[in-house]
């Protein structure tokens, strides 16, 4: 399947299919040099898939640390210096092969190298179906996640579904959080549909039918980011579950999607408090338990520490913490939330696990 962005200009294709990786070769000839920045774990399993591409004299492979460990100033400088040592021109391509962190990191390299070179995303995880589309790239700071970055569109997104076959279950769980988030944004019917399809751990682990939901997720994100590329309005909705989730992820060092799922439950609690919504918190907690999400760490949440991370969230303004909240399905808002409400919601979340 081929999707296409519909911006007024500078559009790019998104290939979502088995065997999509073959499309890379059609781009290589266009560039003076190409650098494949590949996640160390992906390289272990799939190095042979890039043998043909690496046979080109102008194509280089750079193995980078897996996951968030790569999104540091140190790794950024080391990688940039290596690429610059090849006397690159602006007609250079950075090709990101890996999960969301790899795409974030490689995209920031592409955005800043010579003030911008070509960038191709080759996502290899379910999680990256979200991050590879929309043009957000960046690295982390000691103050929080993704605080240093840019909006930078790729030249193409090449999503070969073959990569998903070797994902460990932890990564399936992490990626599913973003797929589920897109369903929540699409409303009650879409949420019920995905919950009925992926109703337990066994079905989720099989990935049966995941292709369809990944494609739906990409289409959902495309509709939003094309309407609001620079996150001035509706694009903020894509941060559902992320205000609290990022804080939990950064402090407790758990996978991104696991933390986002905790953040989704948390925002339901906040919405119930602020709007007298009637979200069934037990339903969502039980659903996550059925899927196999490890939630024991919720009892160890320390609000004061997490709140300091929430204060650094990119959605905030001078008035304080802003959260994306589902008031009712189909009625999503970006709302300022006071510290006391946030604290009470954290305390209430913990009561479900005592």
Curated annotation (Swiss-Prot):
GO terms for cellular component: cytoplasm
Residues where NAD(+) binds: 100-104, 124-125, 136, 145, 163-166
Keywords of this entry: Amino-acid biosynthesis, Aromatic amino acid biosynthesis, Cobalt, Cytoplasm, Lyase, Metal-binding, NAD, Nucleotide-binding, Zinc
Record: residues binding Zn(2+): 178, 242, 256
Enzyme Commission number(s): 4.2.3.4
Cofactor, free-text remark: Binds 1 divalent metal cation per subunit. Can use either Co(2+) or Zn(2+).
InterPro entries in the cross-refs: Dehydroquinate_synthase, DHQ_synth_AroB, DHQ_synth_fam, DHQS/DOIS_N, DHQS_C
Location (main, coarse): cytoplasm
NCBIfam families found in the cross-reference section: aroB
Family: Belongs to the sugar phosphate cyclases superfamily. Dehydroquinate synthase family.
Function: Catalyzes the conversion of 3-deoxy-D-arabino-heptulosonate 7-phosphate (DAHP) to dehydroquinate (DHQ).
Protein name: 3-dehydroquinate synthase
Taxonomic lineage of the native organism: Bacteria, Bacillati, Bacillota, Bacilli, Bacillales
Gene that this sequence comes from: aroB
């Amino acid at each position: 399947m081929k999707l296409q962005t519909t911006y007024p200009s500078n559009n790019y294709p998104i290939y979502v299919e088995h065997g999509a990786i073959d499309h890379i070769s059609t781009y290589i000839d266009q560039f003076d040099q190409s650098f494949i920045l590949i996640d160390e774990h992906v390289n272990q399993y799939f190095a042979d898939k890039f043998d043909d591409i690496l046979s080109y004299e102008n194509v280089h492979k750079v193995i980078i640390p897996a996951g968030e460990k790569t999104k540091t100033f140190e790794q950024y400088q080391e990688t940039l210096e290596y690429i610059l040592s090849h006397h690159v021109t602006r007609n250079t391509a950075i090709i990101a092969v890996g999960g969301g962190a790899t795409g974030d990191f490689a995209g920031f390299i592409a955005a800043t190298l010579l003030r911008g070179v070509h960038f191709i995303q080759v996502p290899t995880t379910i999680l990256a179906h979200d991050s590879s589309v929309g043009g957000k790239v960046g690295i982390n700071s000691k103050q929080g996640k993704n605080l240093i970055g840019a909006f930078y569109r790729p030249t193409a997104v090449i999503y070969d579904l073959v990569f998903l076959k070797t994902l460990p279950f932890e990564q399936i769980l992490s990626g599913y959080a973003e797929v589920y988030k897109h369903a929540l944004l699409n409303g009650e019917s879409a949420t019920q549909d995905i919950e009925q399809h992926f109703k337990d751990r066994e079905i989720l682990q099989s990935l049966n039918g995941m292709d369809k939901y990944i494609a739906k997720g990409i289409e959902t994100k495309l509709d939003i980011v094309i309407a609001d590329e620079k996150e001035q309005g509706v694009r903020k909705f894509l941060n559902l579950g992320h205000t609290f989730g990022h804080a939990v992820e950064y402090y407790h060092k758990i996978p991104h999607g696991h933390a986002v799922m905790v953040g989704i439950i948390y925002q339901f609690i906040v919405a119930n408090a602020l709007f007298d919504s009637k979200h069934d918190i037990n339903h969502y907690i039980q659903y996550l338990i059925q899927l196999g999400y490890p939630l024991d760490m919720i009892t160890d949440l320390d609000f004061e520490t997490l709140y300091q991370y929430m204060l650094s969230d990119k959605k905030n303004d001078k008035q304080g913490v802003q959260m994306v909240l589902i008031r009712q399905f189909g009625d999503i808002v970006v709302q300022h939330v006071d510290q006391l409400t946030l604290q009470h919601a954290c305390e209430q979340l913990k009561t479900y696990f005592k």
